[in-house]
Structures are given as structure tokens and as C-alpha cells.
């Protein structure tokens, strides 16, 4: 079960990008990877053609494994730090909750 979703703010907990944070752009549950804005940047040499308007060296985000990411706690004394996620039933719906502060994670998302 994926605990990280598109639009979440996450922090990298291991690897060369440790302690960098960003917003999740895309999640691929089958491959257990995610694209995070501003994290794990790579450079690609790209030729101009019909599909690519820009040519030269392009810097873009590469996928990063979900096991290296942790959600950022939105509220409480641990605001901005990594937290685990638990699920609670609220009005017969599953709600994601930060373990450290107990605050809901899906409040303003659609």
C-alpha cells in the first residue's frame, strides 16, 4: 500500500539527496518510485525534433525509490520533520494521519 501520494511534501531520508525536500509530482506504484520536484536531478543530452522543442543539455528530475522518502509533518512541534503515516476511520472513510503530531494529511487535497 502506498502511503505517499501526488502533491505530498516529502523529505529524502537516505542516499545522495539526503535531507532534501520537495513536492511529489508523480507516483508509480508498480515500480515503487516517485518524481519529486527539485530532488534527484539528472542531465540529459537532447536533440531537437518534433516532440522536443528544446535542444542541448536538459536538467530534469529522475525517479527515486519510495523507501527513500518520508512524509513531512505539516503541524505540531515536529513541523517540517519526517513522519510515518497511519490510517484511521473517520465517518466510514480511511484518513491518512501523521504519527508524530496526529494531524490529518488529506485535509486540503482533492
UniProtKB/Swiss-Prot annotation:
SMART domains noted in UniProt: KOW
Gene Ontology annotations of biological process type: translation
Family of the protein in this entry: Belongs to the universal ribosomal protein uL24 family.
Gene behind this protein: rplX
PROSITE patterns: RIBOSOMAL_L24
Pfam annotation, one family: ribosomal_L24
Keyword set, alphabetical order: Ribonucleoprotein, Ribosomal protein, RNA-binding, rRNA-binding
A GO molecular function held by the record: rRNA binding
Assembly and oligomerization: Part of the 50S ribosomal subunit.
Domain of life: Bacteria
Disulfide bond sites: none
UniProt protein name: Large ribosomal subunit protein uL24
One CC-aspect GO term: ribosome
Function: One of two assembly initiator proteins, it binds directly to the 5'-end of the 23S rRNA, where it nucleates assembly of the 50S subunit. One of the proteins that surrounds the polypeptide exit tunnel on the outside of the subunit.
Amino acid at each position: 500500500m502506498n502511503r505517499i501520494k501526488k502533491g505530498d511534501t516529502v523529505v529524502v531520508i537516505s542516499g545522495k539527496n539526503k535531507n532534501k525536500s520537495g513536492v511529489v509530482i508523480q507516483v508509480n506504484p508498480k515500480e515503487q518510485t516517485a518524481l519529486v520536484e527539485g530532488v534527484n536531478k539528472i542531465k540529459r543530452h537532447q536533440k531537437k525534433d518534433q516532440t522536443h522543442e528544446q535542444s542541448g543539455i536538459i536538467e530534469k528530475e529522475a525517479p527515486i525509490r519510495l523507501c527513500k522518502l518520508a512524509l513531512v509533518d505539516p503541524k505540531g512541534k515536529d513541523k517540517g520533520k519526517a513522519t510515518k503515516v497511519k490510517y484511521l476511520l473517520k465517518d466510514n472513510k480511511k484518513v491518512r494521519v501523521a504519527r508524530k503530531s496526529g494531524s490529518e494529511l488529506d485535509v486540503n487535497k482533492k
